[in-house]
């Protein structure tokens, strides 16, 4: 995929084959594609020239640090990073608790508020290789370990103007927000498809009793088809800033999270005792499904967002 082709159609909506196999890998692919999305939609020509192609081809890896900013936009948290203007850029301090797909030479995009200028925000690329950034390993997760998730500390990080994605960041965030969410769709769509496959796999030995369960593979097949169609329809116009379109995107994301949990729960019940073995993938899919429902924007945040729109 050549850089410059992705900014018209978020590539993550096509990630469901990855999500069908592994939720953690799909999540990391979302992180990388979101980094591509940020660069593709920046108006900073020097940033585009230096990073655009390398992000898109995977020569430089990285992720997204918008969990805290996304929550701050809806009054759930305060922005955790502060920056002050200096010659040639900004100096940034603060800490982010969760940023994924990181390593010693990776980049990620995030947002700080300008000191003494409440509400004025700047989005930038953070370079994990510099000494002013410290990556703190997180405690073991229920699932999704191996995704390069760290707490990140900023100790007077110098952010050159060439690393600024958007200043001011408000209009830029409104431009990229739908794509940011639609990029997550593949995680849920792929997981639901595999849960349907799991239910079908045990139909021969257990179908005579599983037919009494209230949710069947055919039910989720119809739901999956509807979610796929809606995702692709919304992905045709990711820069639409109308409130009605934004509501549809948020509702879709909410439905994807809830459908993922429902499908994994049903698959677990269809498998019965065999699904309770650590060796069976259905218990992993259940744990991954909860991640789809709690990763930013989480189910509770999405419901608040719908209330606020």
Q: For each predicted feature, which ranges?
A:
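Generic structural signal for well-ordered, non-transmembrane alpha-helical segments
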Residues: 190, 218-225, 250, 254-261, ...
């Amino acid at each position: 995929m050549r850089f410059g082709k992705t900014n018209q159609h978020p590539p993550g909506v096509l990630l469901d084959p990855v999500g069908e196999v592994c939720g953690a890998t799909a999540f990391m692919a979302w992180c990388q594609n979101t980094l591509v999305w940020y660069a593709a939609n920046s108006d900073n020509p020097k940033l585009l020239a230096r990073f655009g192609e390398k992000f898109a081809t995977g020569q430089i890896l990285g992720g997204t640090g918008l969990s805290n900013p996304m929550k701050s936009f809806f009054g759930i948290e305060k922005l955790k990073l502060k920056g002050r203007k200096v010659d040639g850029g900004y100096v940034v301090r603060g800490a982010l608790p969760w940023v994924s797909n990181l390593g010693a030479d990776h980049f990620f995009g995030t947002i700080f508020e300008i000191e003494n200028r409440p509400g004025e925000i700047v989005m930038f690329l953070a370079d994990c290789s510099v000494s002013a950034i410290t990556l703190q390993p997180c405690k073991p997760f229920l699932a999704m370990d191996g995704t390069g998730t760290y707490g990140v500390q900023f100790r007077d990080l110098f952010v050159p103007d060439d690393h600024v994605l958007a200043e001011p960041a408000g209009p830029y965030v409104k431009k990229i927000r739908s794509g940011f969410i639609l990029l997550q769709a593949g995680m849920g769509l792929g997981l639901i498809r595999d849960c349907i496959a799991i239910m079908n796999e045990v139909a021969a030995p257990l179908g005579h009793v599983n037919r009494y369960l209230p949710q069947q593979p055919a039910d989720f097949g119809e739901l999956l088809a509807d979610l796929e169609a809606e995702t692709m329809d919304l992905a045709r116009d990711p820069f639409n800033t109308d409130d009605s379109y934004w509501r549809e995107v948020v509702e879709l994301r909410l439905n994807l999270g809830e459908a993922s949990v429902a499908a994994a729960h049903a698959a677990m019940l269809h498998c019965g005792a065999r699904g309770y073995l650590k060796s069976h993938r259905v218990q992993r899919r259940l744990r991954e499904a909860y991640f789809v429902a709690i990763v930013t924007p989480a189910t509770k945040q999405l419901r608040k967002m719908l209330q606020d729109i």
